[in-house]
Structure formats: C-alpha cells, structure tokens
UniProtKB/Swiss-Prot annotation:
Record's note on what induces expression: By stress conditions e.g. heat shock.
Organism: Cupriavidus pinatubonensis (strain JMP 134 / LMG 1197)
Family, per entry: Belongs to the heat shock protein 70 family.
Entry-annotated residues carrying Phosphothreonine: 200
Region (Disordered): 611-647
Protein name (Swiss-Prot/TrEMBL): Chaperone protein DnaK
Keyword Phosphoprotein: yes
C-alpha cells in the first residue's frame, strides 16, 4: 500500500508532507521550496502554470492568473462575500448555471474545485518525485469553519486531481496533531490553536490527553470566519497606496489591472517586511502614464501605519476566540498553550492581540507554514494503520437542522458535537391528507431557517392520506468523519424512505466531476507530450551545437562530400526542431549522428594523438628529473611501528 500524503491546501500557499517512520517530512517542490504559492496561470498556448512560475508572470497576465480561489470554493455567486471579491480581483468571477461562483479565464468558465485541483496535482507530483512511486491517497485540510458545501467541493478537487481523499481534516486540529505528537509532557493539556491564514480565520480549543498510552486529541470547540485573512490585509495596503497616489498624482489606479497586479505584489512584500522592520518603502517606477508622461510611485509605510490600517481586521479575530472559549466550557486561564498557525500570525500586532486575550505568550516552536501539512500526514499514517497511538475526536463547526412549520430552524445536531455522529427525530405533516413532505436541510446558528445556509433538499413521497399530525416521519442525520452530512427520511407507517448525501444544493454533479477528471488526465497526457517534445528539442540543439563546433575545428580533414552531407543534415535537424513533431526530430537526430560518425572518429583520433604527445613529454620530463636528483648516501632506513587507535 502506498503512502497517504498530507496536503495543506491553502488560500495563499500550499504544502505537502509525509511520515517517514514516525518522523514528518515536509517535501520540497521542483523549485526547491517547502511551500508552493496557490496560484494558477492559464497561458495562451494552453499551458497551465502552477506555483512560483505562475506568480512570476502574474504582472503581465493578470486576467488569466488565478489566486485565492479557495475563498470561492463551495460558495454561491450571490453571497455578499463573493460580491465583495468581484470588485477586487483582476480576474473575472462569474455565475455558473447552478448559481455557484466560478471563474472566467480565456473564454471558458472553470469551477473553483477544478482550479484547486491544479494545485493539488502539483502537490501530488511533488510527493511522487520524492518517493519515486505513484501517490493516489491523501488527507486534505480545510478551515475548521468550512461548511458542508465547502468540504464537499474540496473533496471534489481532490478527485479531479486524481486523489482518493481518505479524510478531510480541520486545519487547527492538524496543527494540534503536529504540535502534540512531538511533545512528551504527561497529563492533560488544553491548547488554543489560533489560525490566521491567507483567506480564512479559525480558532479551536483542543484537549490533548494520555489515555492508556494513546494520545487523544479532542476538539472541545471551534469558531472562525471563512472570509478573513492575509488577502484582506493586503487589500487594505493596496487601497491606501491607491488613495495616496491619487492625492499625489491625481491618477486613479483602481481600474488599471496591470497596475493592480504590481500593487498586490508590493503590498504583500511590504506587509512581510513590516513584521521585522519599522518602515518599508514601496517603489514602483512606470506604474502608469498620462498625457504628461510616465508616473512613478514612491511611498514609505511605517509599521504603525499598517497596524492602523488593519486594526479592525485583527480585532475581528478576538470575538470568535471569546465564543470558542465559552463553547468549550473553559476559562481563558485554563489554556496551557497557545499555538499560532498561518503566515499572518508572524505580524507582531497579531501576536500582541493574542497575548493580550489569552494572557500568555504563544509557543514559538511550531512552524506556522508547515504544521498543518505535517498534521495531515500524521492523520494519513493513522488511517493507513502505521500509527495506532493516536485518537482524533473532531467536531462539526456549525449546527445542522431542518426547516419546520413557520420557517423555524429545528436543530438536529448542534455545533461542536463530536463527529462522526447520528441523530434521529420524528416529525409529522402540517396539512390534512398531505401526500409528500419536502425536507430542507440547513446549516447555521440562526433561529429562522432562511437566515442559515441551505445545504440541500429532497422529497419523501407516497404518504397515505391522513389527518395532519398523524403520519410519523423519522428524519435522521448522520455526519461522517469528514464532516460531510448524510440525511434520511422514513415514513414509519409504510416503511418508505429516501436518503441523500448532501452535495450542497448545487455543487458539481457526478458527470461534471468525471468530465473534469478526464480533462485533467488529458492535460497530464498533453503535459507529458510537451515535456517529451522539449527534451527532444534540447537533444537536437545540443547535437547541432557540438557538430557545428567539430566541423569548424576538423572540417578540413573531411572530404568535401562528407562535409556537405553533415551540413545538410544539420539544416534538416534545425528545421525539424522548429516544428512540433517529436518523431521527425528523433529521426533527424539519428540521421545527423550517422553522417557525422566519420567526423567523430577524426575528433577522437586527434584527441588521442594530443594525449599521446602530452604523455610522452610528461614521461621525458619525469625521467630527466629523476636523473637530476643526486644519490644521498646518508639516507637512513627508519623502523616504524603501526599505531592502532581503535582501542
């Protein structure tokens, strides 16, 4: 059985890890870095770039370079968070036929899971290159506060990337696993995991206990905001720069997509620099131009200014912390350790606020970028049976229920219930002789159903005619270990039942997923062909270069006919290399190799002759030197004794 890899599919960066024995290993990608930007670029020739190569070309291709797509996964186009992003992103966010938020690139509509699958495929390939074997199974992390639709969409992304997703695991829980597994402290510990990433914020209160030699991780509560993260901090800096430039130069950069892409890069860089220095300078020459000529942007930003710009964003993270503590039934003083996860937690002001709330310094021995992937890999080793000393008890982040008479949300499973879990309850009809009931499933905390997220609906039909309130319809909710919901309804009188796995009231259909899997496989085949063609061209270029060099040096030793044949073969190979037929290039490489064989023999013979001359000269020199040394009659033969150090 192959290894189950752990993938942290992040909004801004992604990371992949495996367990070697009991030691977690974060794997470097082909660019040599341990994290990969979650950026995907669609090129004009059909090539898809992922990670650093996509990030490098973003400035010149802003409309077809996608980032922070995780913020759209499993969301409806009409949601206010999505509407807010439409005005900020240089790429287009469009409404799919089923009402979901999709993205538009190069005249095609793409579903967010399809785009995220490109990042997952890169993570899969990174692991395969390191292990030297195919990888088919993974544990993928999601923000703890992701709802059912978002979890389902993440699972779909894994399938499109060719991965069997063994488990969806919450990011703070994964970080707690990574933290807890290498600590030998005995006794129960309560930890708070504060996870502020590129696009989402989570807070989880987790108890780590030793139970009969087994480490038990029990999530007591979780809370968060799936639309708050580093991208929002960047946006505040961008807005500030745009405002200052408008005041200074009278030019509005907010409608210039090329300028916006450069501003985004500069804002992210400034934010990172201000975590370690008090002031930074943003310098962007030729940012735009008007009738008077080119305009340059030069602006200093202090740490204090940045903190003022984002103060309310940091404050927004504290209320969920308060709720999580209350839901866990603990006091702040009972928290033993605070763990910071996500790149944004490197910001001194964030650390300061966390310290102020929890009354203690956060641990510094957890890598905020890698802990989540490491935890996912640990969970993978538990699922594969390699580790038997870990038990993970996670929770559902939001309450689940159905709409009942008067539009009320009747909760079936309350938030922070340990999963997997089941719950059943009996309901009845609202009207006389009602032949069917519609079960509408919602997720959220509001009292009225419409204030919550509709996950899906289905009908139970064939109810025998009877007065209202008489039929007994048992509705059952069953949440699996991935946090994905299965709902059933059964008429106890007739035994008729209907069950659905909540796929969100839209999401991707099975046919769409299969089509995307096929597209991905076709792309992989295209990529393979493109790589083989590039290799063939490289081989052709190298052979042409070395043959031309040899002809220049040794061509006069060849007969005129031989030289002409070689030159003709070089031209044919150069023409073939400009085309796109790999077989043609291979054939011309073979042809040039054959006609230049004589030339190769001449080169080899010449090198042998030169080596022979040098050897003869060297031997003569050494002989002369030997003769020149006078005999010394006073040389004494010394006795020697071998010393053995290994005693």
């Amino acid at each position: 059985m192959g290894k189950i890899i752990g993938i942290d599919l992040g909004t801004t960066n992604s990371c992949v890890s495996i367990l070697e024995g009991n030691t977690p290993k974060v794997i470097e990608n082909s660019e040599g870095t341990r994290t990969t930007p979650s950026i995907i670029a669609y090129m004009e020739d059909g090539e898809i770039l992922v990670g650093a190569p996509a990030k490098r070309q973003a400035v010149t291709n802003p409309r077809n370079t996608l980032y922070a797509v995780k913020r759209l996964i499993g969301r409806k186009f009409e949601e206010k968070e999505v509407q807010k992003d439409i005005g900020l992103m240089p790429y287009s966010i469009v409404k799919a036929d089923n009402g979901d938020a999709w993205v538009g690139v190069r005249d095609q509509k793409l579903a967010p899971p399809q785009v995220s699958a490109e990042v997952l495929r890169k993570m899969k390939k990174t692991a395969e290159d390191y292990l030297g074997e195919p990888v088919t199974e993974a544990v993928i992390t999601v923000p703890a506060y992701f709802n059912d639709s978002q979890r389902q969409a993440t699972k779909d992304a894994g399938r499109i990337a060719g991965l069997d997703v063994k488990r969806i695991i919450n990011e703070p829980t994964a970080a707690a696993l990574a933290f807890g597994m290498d600590k030998n402290e005995k006794g129960d510990r309560k930890i708070a995991v504060y996870d502020l990433g590129g696009g989402t914020f989570d807070i989880s209160i987790i108890e780590i206990a030793d139970v009969d030699g087994e480490k038990q991780f029990e999530v007591l509560s979780t809370n968060g905001d799936t639309f708050l993260g580093g991208e929002d901090f960047d946006q505040r800096i961008i807005d500030y720069i745009i405002g200052e430039f408008k005041k200074d130069q009278g030019v509005d950069l907010s409608k210039d997509v090329l300028a916006l892409q450069r501003l985004k890069e500069a804002a992210e860089k400034a934010k990172i620099e201000l975590s370690s220095s008090q002031q930074t300078e943003i310098n962007l020459p030729y940012i735009t131009a008007d009738a008077s000529g080119p305009k340059h942007l030069n602006l200093k930003i202090t740490r204090a200014k940045l903190e003022a710009l984002v103060e309310d964003l940091i404050t927004r993270t504290i209320e969920p912390c308060r709720t999580a503590i209350k839901d866990a039934g603990v006091k702040v003083s009972e928290i033993d350790d605070v763990i910071l996860v996500g790149g944004m937690t490197r910001m001194p002001k964030v650390q300061e606020q966390v310290k102020e709330f929890f009354g203690k310094e956060a641990r510094k021995d957890v890598n905020p970028d890698e802990a989540v992937a490491v935890g996912a890999a640990i969970q993978g080793s538990v699922l594969s049976g390699d580790r038997k000393d870990v038990l993970l008890l996670d929770v559902t982040p939001l309450s689940l229920g159905i709409e009942t008479l008067g539009g009320v949300m009747t909760k079936m499973i309350t938030k922070n219930t340990t999963i997997p879990t089941k719950h059943a309850q009996v309901f009845s009809t609202a009207d006389d002789n009602q032949p069917a009931v519609t079960i509408k499933v919602y997720q959220g905390e509001r009292e009225m159903a419409t204030g919550n997220k509709l996950l899906g609906e289905f009908n139970l039909e064939g109810i025998p005619p009877s007065p209202r309130g008489t039929p007994q319809i048992e509705v059952s909710f069953d949440i699996d270990a991935n946090g994905i919901l299965h709902v059933g309804a059964k008429d106890k009188a007739t035994g008729k039942e209907n069950r659905i796995t909540i796929k969100a009231n839209s999401g991707l259909s099975e046919d769409e997923i299969q089509r995307m899997v096929k597209d991905a496989e076709a792309n992989a085949e295209e990529d393979k062909k493109a790589r083989e063609l590039a290799d063939a061209r490289n081989q052709a270029d190298a052979l042409v270069h070395s043959t031309k060099k040899a002809v220049t040096e040794y061509g006069d030793k060849l007969e005129a006919g031989e030289k002409e044949k070689i030159e003709a073969a070089i031209k044919e190979l150069e023409d073939a290399a400009r085309g796109g037929d790999k077989a043609e290039i291979d054939a011309k490489v073979t042809a040039l190799s054959e006609v230049s064989q004589k030339l190769g023999e001449k080169v080899y013979a010449d090198m042998q002759a030169k080596a022979g001359e040098q050897g003869a000269a060297g031997a003569a020199g050494a002989g002369a030197q030997q003769q020149a040394q006078p005999q010394d009659d006073n040389v004494v033969d010394a006795e020697f004794k071998e010393v053995n150090d290994k005693k």
